[in-house]
């Protein structure tokens, strides 16, 4: 009997040790910055995943003009990010993650801007208002809290290496862009031979940063702020779209141009059988008028650009 008790106790003790070692290993793994970011931004991912803008992008429901404006927003965003990365390339909390040859996107985006807007593209564009807050935040972090810069770099570049490749194919197919890469240079990482291996290297470097738990928590918080900026931009997009639609109607923009058979208008064709024509306005004409508004174009651009960033997270 006593021998059985001792054996049982011995097994129990061994199990306790194994359980303790496993728990410690899990705690260490969960303390890795990459794991903390993954777990700590799940809720933000879920909110973004249900955004109609994101769903439409995946379906290829994008217009070339909006894609051009999205490229504009990306150009200003990455210009700010890479300026601050250059400023902090020797900072101990960021230096191991400084990969200008492999990751930097400004030069690629410059090529895309030239493709879409021509050689004098710099005279034609300005930083979209909707993207300005995020640009300002990046500059603030780079100049005042560089230890948090990793939140923005990791969110952007790791996503670009993942879902960005899916977005490239969607854009090329939907917009009939050249398969040789014109207009989508942003998604081409010429100096990264194996994206999966590079992402593993980047995460390992990030996890090896000498950061205490409080700083890691602040980095996760900063990553969530980036997602919040995205959500705010989508909300602004919806509000601006509604406001400008009202302005268009108040300005007396014609509901239908009166040329040809009115029944061929997709809106009227769908509503005719319902007896709902009276008092209705055609959203297709309204949408075209709204999209001609420069202010809304830039809001849509920022929304498209940040949607691309959100989508990229889904494939990491």
Swiss-Prot record:
Post-translational modifications reported in the UniProt record: S-nitrosylated by BLVRB.
Leader peptide range in chain numbering: none
Keyword Metal-binding included in the entry's annotation: yes
A Pfam family it matches: Heme_oxygenase
Keyword Nucleotide-binding annotated: no
Mapped HRM repeat ranges: 264-269, 281-286
Record-level Gene Ontology MF annotations: heme binding; heme oxygenase (decyclizing) activity; metal ion binding
Protein name: Heme oxygenase 2
Species, as recorded: Macaca fascicularis
Highest classification ranks of the organism: Eukaryota, Metazoa, Chordata, Craniata, Vertebrata
Gene (name only): HMOX2
């Amino acid at each position: 009997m006593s021998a059985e008790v001792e054996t049982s106790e011995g097994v129990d003790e061994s199990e306790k040790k194994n359980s303790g070692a496993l728990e410690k290993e899990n705690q260490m793994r969960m303390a890795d910055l990459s794991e903390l970011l993954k777990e700590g931004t799940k809720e933000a991912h879920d909110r973004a995943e249900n955004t109609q803008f994101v769903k439409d992008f995946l379906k290829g429901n994008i217009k070339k003009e909006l894609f051009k404006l999205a490229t504009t927003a990306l150009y200003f965003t990455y210009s700010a990010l890479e300026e601050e990365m250059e400023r902090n390339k020797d900072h101990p909390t960021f230096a191991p993650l400084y990969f200008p040859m492999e990751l930097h996107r400004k030069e690629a985006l410059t090529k895309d801007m030239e493709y879409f807007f021509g050689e004098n593209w710099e005279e034609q564009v300005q930083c979209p208002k909707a993207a300005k807050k995020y640009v300002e935040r990046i500059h603030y972090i780079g100049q005042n809290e560089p230890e948090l810069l990793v939140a923005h770099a990791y969110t952007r570049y790791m996503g670009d290496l993942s879902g960005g490749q899916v977005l490239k194919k969607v854009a090329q197919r939907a917009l009939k862009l050249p398969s040789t890469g014109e207009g989508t240079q942003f998604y081409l990482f010429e100096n990264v031979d194996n994206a999966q291996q590079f992402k593993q290297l980047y995460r390992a470097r990030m996890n090896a940063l000498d950061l205490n738990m409080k700083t890691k928590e602040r980095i996760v918080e900063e990553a969530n702020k980036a997602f919040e900026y995205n959500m705010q931009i989508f909300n602004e997009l919806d509000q601006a779209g509604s406001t400008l639609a009202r302005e268009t109607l108040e300005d007396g923009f014609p509901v239908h141009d009166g040329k040809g058979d009115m029944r061929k208008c997709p809106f009227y064709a769908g509503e005719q059988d319902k007896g709902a024509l009276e008092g209705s306005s055609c959203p297709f004409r309204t949408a075209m008028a709204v999209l001609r508004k420069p202010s809304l174009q830039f809001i849509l651009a920022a929304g498209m650009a940040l949607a691309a960033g959100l989508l990229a997270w889904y494939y990491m």
